[in-house]
Amino acid sequence: YESMHKLPDVKWDLIIADEAHGMGAFPKPSKRAKDFRALVSKTKARVILLSGTPTPESYSQMYHQVYALPSGPFHKYKNFYGFANDNVDVKLKRIGGHSIKDYTAGQSKILADMAPYTISYTQEEAGFVVETTEKVLEVELLPVTYEIMRKLRKDLVVEGKEEVILADTAVKLMIKMHQLCSGTIKFESGNSKVIDYTKAQFIKETFKGKRIGIFYKFKQELHALKSVFGDALTESLDEFNAGGQVIALQIVSGREGISLQKAEALVYYNIDFSATSYWQSKDRMTTKDRLKNDVYWIFAKGGIERDIYKAVTKKKDYTLNHFKRDLLNLF
């Protein structure tokens, strides 16, 4: 999608857009959605949209996926806000002392309106019979890591000899805790560091001899993996497919458009707040010939990851409200 501007100046008869849910941002259309709309308008092409998860977090995500279509189900609406007046239960949400409109409660009639335009297949109907097994494995982090997290929760600041960890807002506290539960931290200065290699070492020992794909969240987690695995780890899909033992991919960038069919298992160093990331990334090994997928989640004992997991498996993003509720029960 980011390379649409490089397409040759051809009057296409048909455009097929894969992973169409990537255009579903709202209330404002994303650059991806606007560029796609311009392409359709220019070429007057027919369009086929493909997605395994068209509305992973909200039915409201449907509008900008189809707003490029001049005869689509919602073409009568000038913009998302007009669409929302008829199709969304708009609520007010308090954030930072301000009230903002929340458009996530799209009504089920959105899907009903889409039905005449939609062909739906389950994986089984499409010939995929894979059984996915997920296992959560907990590790005990270093005592100093838990000490830092407890102090940060209590004081909202941890001062070292050279660096400071500051969590002066609820959002920053959530992100810092998320980082620390996998043994990394980004300091107030902007510098980052691995302070605990426990997860990386556990993965190396537990999956020794297996070809695995590892999903990580933060950049320093990749640094930890490189330090522990050395030359056995690659970030190149071509190298992995050619016989590589371990591939590491960032969750968001690796959740779509790639196949890890050569992997024996998927291992998650960390977990993303996004339900889309959960449902998309864990399906990267699936092929028609494969009968079983093994997926492993590596969580810190007493950490935030299990609470995130509970949310995203129910197709809900993990939010600040979840974190405020869960904070007192951590470690």
Located regions from the model:
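Phosphate- and divalent-cation-binding pockets in alpha/beta enzyme and binding domains
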Residues: 3-6, 58-64, 148, 221-225, ...
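Conserved Helicase C-terminal RecA-like lobe
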Residues: 11, 128-261, 265, 323-331
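A conserved SF2-helicase RecA2
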Residues: 273-282, 286-331
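A short beta-strand element within the Helicase C-terminal
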Residues: 64, 259-271, 294-297
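Conserved helix/coil segment N-terminal to the catalytic DExD/H
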Residues: 1-14
